[in-house]
Structure formats: C-alpha cells, structure tokens
Amino acid sequence: MNRGNVGGGLIVGGGRGKTTQMASFLCEGGQIVPTDQPPCPVRTRPAIVYRDCLSRGTVQKADPLDVQRDIEELHKAFKSADDNVITDILSRRTNDQRQVIAKAYQEKYNTNLHEELKVDLSEQYRKAVSGLLEDPFIFLAKHVRHTLKSSALTHKDVALLEILYPLEPQEVDAIVQAYREEYDHNLEEEIEKEMSGVFKGILVRLVTGKRSTHRKVDVPQRNKDLEYLRNNTEERLQSADDNVIFRFLVLLKSVYNRTGFYADQLHMAIKDISSGSEDRLMRIVISRSEIDLENIKDFFQSAYSHTLTDFVYDDTSGDYRNLLLRLVGM
C-alpha cells in the first residue's frame, strides 16, 4: 500500500514492511528532533514543558482581567440565552482566567457555571462551552473516557492513540491522574478491560509511563523499538485493514511534525461525517488554542490551500460555529 503524502507533509509508502519499520519509534515514544537545533526555552502550562519553542496560540491572556464585569455580563447572558456575549467573553480568556471567573461566579451567584449551560443553547455549543470551562486535563480525560466507552467507534485503540500519543509525557501523566480523580478508575485497567486492536499494548505502555522521553534517536533505542515491534505489533499490523493502517501512518506524523499531525486531524474531522468527527474538531481546537493553534492554522493553509477558518465556517453553523471561529482566530 502506498498512500503518498499524508496532508502534504510526511511521505509514507513502501508497503506494510516499511510501515512497521516506521512504527519502531512509536512503540516506546521515541521523538525525532534535529540534533543541531538549540534547546527551546522552557514554557509551562500547568507544569508542562513543550517541545516547540516557537509555538503560538490563538487565545491570549486578557490584560487587564475585569472579573466582576465578566461574571455580571455572563449572568445576564445566561438568563437571556445570549450566546454572543457568552462566546465573546469565554473565547477571549485563557483557561486559567476562566477558572478565576467560574470561582467568582459561584461565590456571587451560588451557581456553578456548568449548571447555567442548561439554558436554551444548542447541544454542540453547550459541549464546547463546557469544555472551555474545564481544567485542560479533565477536558482531555473526558474525551478519553468517551472514546473508551463509545459503542460507535470501530477502532478505539487508534482513536485513543490520536488523543494521547502526540502529547508530552507529563501531559499524559496529568490526564491519567485527572481520569482517576474524575472517574475513580485506573486508566491502565480501563484500557486493559475495554480495549482491543492492534495498538492496545502501545496504549498500556503509554499510560504507564513506559515510553522513552529522549528526543534524539540512537541505534540502541532503535533496535529496542524494533524488537518490541516484532514481538508485539508487527503480526497484527499485517492483518489490519487499510483504514487502520492509514490512520496509523497519519499518527506517525506526530513523531516528526506535531503541528502537521494536528492540521491533518482537523482536516479529517471536518471532512469525515462518521461518529466522533465533531468531537475531534472540538477537542483539538479547544485543547490547542493556547498552545500552538496559530502554527496549526499556518500548516493547514499550506497543506490544503484553504484556511482553517474557511473550513470551519463551511462545516459548522450557528452559535457553535461562532465560538469555534473565535477560538481559531478569524
């Protein structure tokens, strides 16, 4: 099988044997980073260090932040189901600032902001606003939970890898902890119980921290990866259907180019009418909006000759569309 370019970036091909060789880096999370690049300055978002020193988010901190004005405007907006005001405020605040607003709202009105979302708003819009109000790792933990428990997904292992594998090890650890706190269950045990498929073993290694955090690829690590692949994955990859193989190749792109991977994921989510595509679109836009969504937009336009804004506008509607467009940055 030869798919050629995936999203105009990583070139993959050469049949299933070549696929399994490329997969060697995925097995233990080896990251390929040019050795001649200077180290990136440390950037944190709750205690997470990111790989990309030139990452640019679309959502910036509001300065100054007028918390009292925000909660009063939100209170009136929820009473009248004014989605324009809700969107205008929450899409222009960082997650940390939204947490401050939510706490102040609770203290003043004795009501949780999530409860206020029960007003006459569309379902997708409510889900998106609720996601904005969540702690970032609880938000992703809920998407992990939905993937695990979904009866509509045919390849849960690949869908779950698409959420977890591109993240930093510290982020995965934070999601595992958030999952435990939110659902009182161990994510490793849940994967063992709920999952099947080609990549179940890789998922278990991922959530238990048994992945390399080294950025440079060396021969011993490569050989170790290949040995793990031969023993655990290669035979099952040979019998996997083309859809799984193609999605796996797209996933491999996150090893080389995380920005390109997310651009491809957004393109697939917008073009795909299958179950879960809308959630994928929402998850990526919200979770990357403060990190590198501006970079993803640039790559998207380069790869697909259209802006992400145009794609979102054409594929969504109403209050949900307006919120996503604000987050994407019109």
What are these regions (language model features)?
Residues 2-330:
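Structural signature for extended repeat/solenoid scaffolds and their inter-repeat hinge/linker regions
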